[in-house]
């Protein structure tokens, strides 16, 4: 069995991996995302994912597969990561409701067994429901949107306020499982090698 390391403290990403039989070692990269200033949304999430994975990979003493991810919501050309505070989350939801956005997740898989690195991007369209200010306030009061890129969790209460997903649902949660399978295959592995 290959050692699999998740370079993220995200419980949602860990749970997605566990749901497919991968029990990762979890290392938080503590990479300072503010040190990266890239205007292109696609390049930004891929660079952040790579940096997070590299920080963790450089700390490991033994070979492993190291997965780093970074997600942002792009709405009307603007990037939204995690909200700063409840007021920010409320303001975001007031601008997001009834709109469509793109959830971008950069994925980096570093193979320390073969000294190879793959960097990929998954984009999923998210159509948000029109919800009232009262619903927004109640949702934000749960605290859930404060820990999520785009201020919503598809796999939580936030799923109530998403009308449609076009593309990969697991990508919206933080990790595209089909893309991970393709990346493992490109490196010559099967997901079962990580079970």
Curated annotation (Swiss-Prot):
It holds the Pfam family Maf. Keywords: Cytoplasm, Hydrolase, Nucleotide metabolism. GO terms for cellular component: cytoplasm. The keyword Hydrolase applies. InterPro entries: ITPase-like_fam, Maf-like. Its cofactor is a divalent metal cation. One of its GO terms (biological process) is nucleotide metabolic process. Its EC number is 3.6.1.9. PANTHER family: BIFUNCTIONAL DTTP/UTP PYROPHOSPHATASE/METHYLTRANSFERASE PROTEIN-RELATED (PTHR43213), BIFUNCTIONAL DTTP_UTP PYROPHOSPHATASE_METHYLTRANSFERASE PROTEIN-RELATED (PTHR43213:SF5). Nucleoside triphosphate pyrophosphatase. May have a dual role in cell division arrest and in preventing the incorporation of modified nucleotides into cellular nucleic acids. Belongs to the Maf family. This is Nucleoside triphosphate pyrophosphatase. It comes from Cyanothece sp. (strain PCC 7425 / ATCC 29141). The lineage of its organism: Bacteria, Bacillati, Cyanobacteriota, Cyanophyceae, Gomontiellales.
């Amino acid at each position: 069995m290959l050692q699999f390391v998740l370079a993220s403290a995200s419980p949602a990403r860990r749970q997605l991996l566990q749901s497919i039989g991968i029990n990762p070692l979890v290392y938080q990269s503590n990479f300072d995302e503010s040190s990266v200033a890239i205007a292109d949304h696609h390049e930004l999430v891929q660079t952040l994912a790579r940096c997070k994975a590299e920080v963790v990979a450089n700390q490991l003493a033994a070979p492993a597969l190291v997965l780093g991810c970074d997600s942002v919501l792009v709405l009307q050309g603007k990037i939204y990561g995690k909200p700063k505070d409840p007021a920010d989350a409320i303001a975001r939801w007031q601008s997001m409701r009834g709109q469509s956005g793109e959830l971008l997740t950069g994925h980096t898989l570093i193979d320390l067994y073969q000294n190879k690195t793959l960097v990929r991007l998954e984009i999923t369209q998210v159509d948000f429901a029109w919800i009232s200010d009262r619903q927004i306030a109640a949702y934000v009061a749960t605290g859930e949107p404060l820990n999520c890129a785009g201020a919503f969790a598809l796999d939580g209460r936030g799923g109530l306020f998403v009308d449609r997903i076009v593309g990969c649902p697991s990508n919206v949660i933080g990790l595209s499982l089909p893309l991970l399978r393709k990346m493992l295959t490109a490196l010559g592995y099967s997901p079962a090698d990580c079970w």
